[in-house]
């Protein structure tokens, strides 16, 4: 005999919460799938455009096309995260200029010492270290007045660049110690991020120099720079040196500004004069390329008078 059904006694305790959780999970899953599908569709569209162009390249200029493909693959495989996003970003996204410059960058690699990607200052020759420490000591000693001048001249904006020297060309001249030519350091600036401002993953164009960042006001928060598998929180280590042609991003998830010393130093090499000369030759082209890379940045001026060095 069948047992008689028990009369309905209402929902079980927690049943509503279970249904809510299931609904949230399903909604979140659909949202994630939608985002993934959108990204995949975007990548597929890029490949659909690239494949015919690649076919034309192999048909009309096969040797040159092969050289660029091989050099690009050698170059991109230096990165840690070898996934679809890496290859799509390098060949079809903001890494396109890095790919086009890959034959030149690989030639530069042959003229320089081994490049570990992420560097420690101790890995540089002693005269390089002395120059870096000289510049950083000036920033540490004059941090408050430099930040005050930046804040006075950078009212509204997502990201700003306060430049003393840009690939050897002098800009802001109110710090007398920076009004000279350095042997190895070719760019001296301060990078400023407004609150909760971050970059996307991106590649830099040239490997003639390395990027040195130093956080002037490290805060214990989600403020970091990430290059491949290396994630550097500024409160743990205020200095980060890396090859910016590798995939990287900078994140400021803090309700305040982030101020980082921003320097480019020529690659350590048995031929430092040659590397410096090559950088001087391409500096005009580099400036034009960088104007595209830094289109979301505001170049910050200064209202402070020029500081004349006293003797």
Language model: regions and residue ranges:
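Short beta-strand His + acidic residue motifs that chelate non-heme Fe in jelly-roll/DSBH
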Residues: 200-202, 223-225, 242, 248-254
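A short glycine-rich, His/Asp/Glu-containing loop-to-beta-strand
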Residues: 176-195, 208
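Short, conserved beta-strand element in jelly-roll/cupin
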Residues: 192-194, 205-221
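A short hydrophobic beta-strand segment most commonly corresponding to one strand
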Residues: 211-215, 241, 256-272
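Conserved metal-binding segment of the jelly-roll/cupin
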Residues: 233-247
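Non-heme Fe(II)/2-oxoglutarate
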Residues: 64, 72-178
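A short beta-strand-loop-beta hairpin characteristic of the jelly-roll/cupin
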Residues: 215-236
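N-terminal alpha-helical membrane-insertion module
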Residues: 2-5, 18, 22-114
């Amino acid at each position: 005999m069948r047992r008689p059904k028990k009369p309905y006694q209402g929902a079980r305790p927690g049943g509503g919460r279970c249904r809510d959780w299931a609904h949230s999970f399903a909604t979140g899953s659909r949202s994630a799938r939608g985002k993934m599908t959108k990204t995949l569709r975007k990548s597929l569209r890029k490949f659909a455009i690239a494949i015919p162009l690649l076919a034309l390249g192999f048909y009309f200029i096969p040797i040159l096309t092969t050289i660029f493909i091989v050099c690009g693959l050698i170059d991109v495989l230096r990165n840690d995260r070898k996934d679809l996003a890496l290859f799509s970003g390098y060949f079809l996204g903001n890494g396109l200029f890095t790919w086009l410059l890959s034959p030149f960058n690989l030639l530069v690699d042959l003229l320089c010492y081994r490049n570990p990607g992420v560097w420690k200052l101790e890995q540089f020759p002693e005269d390089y270290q002395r120059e870096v420490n000289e510049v950083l000591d000036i920033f540490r000693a004059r941090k408050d007045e430099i930040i005050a001048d930046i804040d006075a001249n950078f009212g509204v904006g997502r990201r700003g660049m306060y430049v003393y020297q840009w690939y050897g060309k002098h800009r802001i001249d109110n710090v007398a110690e920076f009004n000279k030519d350095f042997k190895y350091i070719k760019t001296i600036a301060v990078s400023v991020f407004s609150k909760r401002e971050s970059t996307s993953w991106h590649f830099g164009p040239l490997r003639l120099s390395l990027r040195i960042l130093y956080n002037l006001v490290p805060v214990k928060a989600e403020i970091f720079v990430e290059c491949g598998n290396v994630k550097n929180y500024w409160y743990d280590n205020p200095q980060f040196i890396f090859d910016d042609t590798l995939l990287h991003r900078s994140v400021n998830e803090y309700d305040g500004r982030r101020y980082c010393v921003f320097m480019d130093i020529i690659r350590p090499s048995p031929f430092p004069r040659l590397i410096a000369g090559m950088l001087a030759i391409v500096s005009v082209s580099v400036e034009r390329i960088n104007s595209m890379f830094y289109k979301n940045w505001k170049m910050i001026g200064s209202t402070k008078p020029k500081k004349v060095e006293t003797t």
